[in-house]
Amino acid sequence: MAEASEAMCLEGAEWELSKENIQPLRHGRVMSTLQGALAKQESAGHTALQQQKRAFESEIRFYSGDDPLDVWDRYINWTEQNYPQGGKESNMSALVERAIEALQGETRYYNDPRFLSLWIKLGHLCNEPLDMYSYLQSQGIGVSLAQFYISWAEEYEARENFKKADIIFQEGIERKAEPLDRLQSQHRQFQSRVSRQAFLALGNEEEEALEPSEPQRSSLAELKSRGKKMARAPISRVGGALKAPGQSRGFLNAVPQPVHGNRRITVFDENADTASRTELSKPVAQPWMAPPVPRAKENELQPGPWSTDRPAGRRPHDNPASVTSIPSVLPSFTPYVEESAQQTVMTPCKIEPSINHVLSTRKPGREEGDPLQRVQSHQQGCEEKKEKMMYCKEKIYAGVGEFSFEEIRAEVFRKKLKERREAELLTSAKKREEMQKQIEEMERRLKAMQAVQQEGAGGQQEEKMPTEDPARLQIASGPQEMSGVPLSCSICPLSSNPREISPAENILQEQPDSKGSSMPFSIFDESLSDKKDKSPATGGPQVLNAQRRPLSVLKTTEVGTTNEDVSPDICDELTELEPLSEDAIITGFRNVTLCPNPEDTCDFARAARLASTPFHEILSSKGIAADPEGLLQEEDLDGKAAEAHHTVHHQALIIKKLSPIIEESREATHSSGFSRSSSSAPSTSSIKGFQLLEKLELTNDGAEDAIQSPWCSQYRLQLLKSLLELSAFAEFSVEDRPMPVLEIGKEIELGPEDYVIKQEHLTCDDYRLFWVAPRSSAELTMIKASSQPIPWDFYINLKLKERLNEDYDQLCSCCQYQDGHVVWYQYINCSTLQNLLQHSEFVTHEIIVLIIYNLLTIVEKLHRAEIVHGDLSPRSLILRNRIHDPYDYVNKDDHAVRIMDFSYSVDLRVQLDAFAYSGFRTAQILEGQKILANCSSPYHVDLLGIADLAHLLLFKEHLHVFWDGLLWKLSQSTSELKDSELWNKFFVRILNASDKSTVSVLGELAAEMGGAFDATFHSHLNRALWKLGKTISPEALLTQQDKQPGGSQSPA
């Protein structure tokens, strides 16, 4: 037996061992809490309960909010659940009394259901609950709540005063107590119970009259008082007590007794004495069929003498005559008593109170009065009290327990410490937000600058230069400028004489002399370059360098051609020049926007050692880079980075290789073909090696940034391959062929059945929606065909089903092809929310409340599973059968809307949350709204999506908000809406979630929305859905689209 008990305890069924000690609650108990409370019988569990109780006591004393009733309500509910056995440990009576005494002066709680619940709990502890309800009615507490009249009527019904109970119900209905439908329902149930009892009573009386049965002794009979005016315990008499006193208890007389007409009927009186019984009429002597059974044998036996002495006044029971008393005879001897003997002292026997505390008598003065009287006396005492306490008495005796001054000081210190830490965290969070805003602003400026530069580079025109001599490179005569930015290039010397000294060679020759001077580095002198350029060139045309000439950009192919035609001597001279490292310059300083210098010259492109000279590189140089494969990689990474909307800052790659005066180079140095020479100076090779290292590091950073993008196709594909094998699921199938062409009227094989495409419903960027029907059925089903071979929707559905278990019933199947996939859902006769917006004249207040309520519950489940949807738009939501079949009550109110597109969803359990929220489609729709910068979590994007959808349904336009200094509010006014208070609370709550958990926010909003679903609401809702179903049903939409030339819709 002991082993079985231990096994039950191990299995978590401790409550099975102590069912009889658990006090039942009308609203039931939480099973997990009950098992935990019963398992915490040890000292550790008891200590944990005491700590939680201490926390509630502290919260009551130091509560600074505007709803103190909430703390008491949570404290009492926690006590009920964690002390299932009741008793002195729970101290429920004192707890309820202190709560009522503390809140009795708050008139705002008089019609609060929580405050009325406290009074009802107090009524269960009172001697006369009816007096308490009369007192509540006189004070106006709970008179507008249905629960007040229901509980009051139940007390009268328990006392079988059905008339008064019915009067109480009628009074509540006349006052229209809320909720009125619940009160009326309880009244009807009460009337049915009374009617049933009346019919049963009539039937029992008829049965007793027709078939009188011998009464039986009742066991465990009730001793509860009955009656309306006088309370008297019922007297149940059975067996021989109901017969006439003259009859025998053993056998009945065979001969009936004659009834004398002039003889009075005597009634048995149990309170009459023995003398009065002799006056009763004696029965007529009749012959006995059998000897009677003696009634009192102990009185018929002759008692024997116990002693020869009888006390005076005693007489034998069988002799009514008086007997003379015999005087007592004293003994004729005297017992001997020793003189030295002492009387033995008896030790008093005292029972241990810990053992026999149940049977100990109650001490005088321990009798406690009625709780209602104590509450009333406390209220009168508070009204009459005029003393002023000079210490914090309210904090010492606020709760049930008592706090010392040291404990109060400690709690005050902890509270201040907590506030200081929260302020520090808030300050640090604000600083992070400001830094993030600055970074985003810098990114936007950089992107704008790059866009302008790309436009200028894309529109740049290139002209072919005429060559007079195939061995020479000439300068184009026509000026070419675009958007006010001068075009730059690397210039080759015009002289065919290999011994002619170019300006760049002059600079290089002067550099050894400059090393010995006091100057730290030499500066390029343009005038000197112009003087040297005036020397005549042999074998070529004279070039006037007094004035700088316009330049032209050579294409890569042209440069390669000219390099082949130039003589080897000229190439050798040119390869001795060290090309400028633009990558080293760009990555060697932080991102600072620099204005291009229009007075720059192409000669600076060859002066690599002149670090103080400003250089400006144009973006078109990427198009003529020496390494086309590296260029494609860089462009690909740039595209991925733009897709992720996240710019990587290369501040960690700061390399101090040049002088302090460093500016961004705009020269097209990559266009020069002479940098490919294999013979170069050692410094040139070292710089080239360092540039290659920097390019590799930058490429790795760009790749990591692309992988971190949650919407990157390659990243999603790698994630699906590493996490799970989709082919192992029965709902997933793979076809090793291209995706079939989806056209209206054609058949497509989906799983074991063939479907016929009826109509194209919606066309989006990367997927399309079709209405299809099985070949053997006319029921329309919606499928989603995507051009991406990544079944991300199916993955999200699997994760939701895995993490939510039975709380998620959305089923879908997927078929993957080589170049796409198709997902079809198990819903029939459904349409998107986009169709509903196109028929806004049928959208009523009830339909909007139903849709938003469904959306709140769905998104709450997504966030519990750590998944962000990111695209809560009309095109991604479908309306289920609850809309088209409003009288089908099998489907609940929270099954009307479902999500069918998870293209923008992010699984935060396996994906990093360090990304820009602007990648969500909801953020793209609300672009320009300042509230987006206030999102501290990806989950908040879904809250804004719900708010935008509600705004779209109510005002027919997207969300517009503003900051009033304290809260985010709508630009539109909700005062003209039906149930404007509900919508005002909804938008204020969902727009100002701040750092709170979105799961709790969504749960609270769903509960508040669900409170509107009463009988009247359902009546209006079903009427509106019936009208709407005729318009947006799939059959009606197919008919309308067949009449239109377009057919498919465009996304919202």
Curated annotation (Swiss-Prot):
It comes from the Eukaryota. ATP binds at L762, T763, C764, D765, D766, Y767, R768, L769, F770, K784. Residues 756-1040 form the Protein kinase domain. Disruption phenotype: Mice die in utero. Residues 206-256, 272-327, 361-381, 496-552 are annotated as: Disordered. Its EC number is 2.7.11.1. Residues 508-520 have a biased composition (Polar residues). A motif (D-box) lies at residues 217-225. The record marks D572, E573, D603, F604 as: Cleavage. One of its GO terms (molecular function) is protein serine/threonine kinase activity. GO terms for biological process: apoptotic process; cell division; metaphase/anaphase transition of mitotic cell cycle; mitotic spindle assembly checkpoint signaling; protein localization to chromosome, centromeric region. Belongs to the protein kinase superfamily. Ser/Thr protein kinase family. BUB1 subfamily. This is Mitotic checkpoint serine/threonine-protein kinase BUB1 beta. The lineage of its organism: Eukaryota, Metazoa, Chordata, Craniata, Vertebrata.
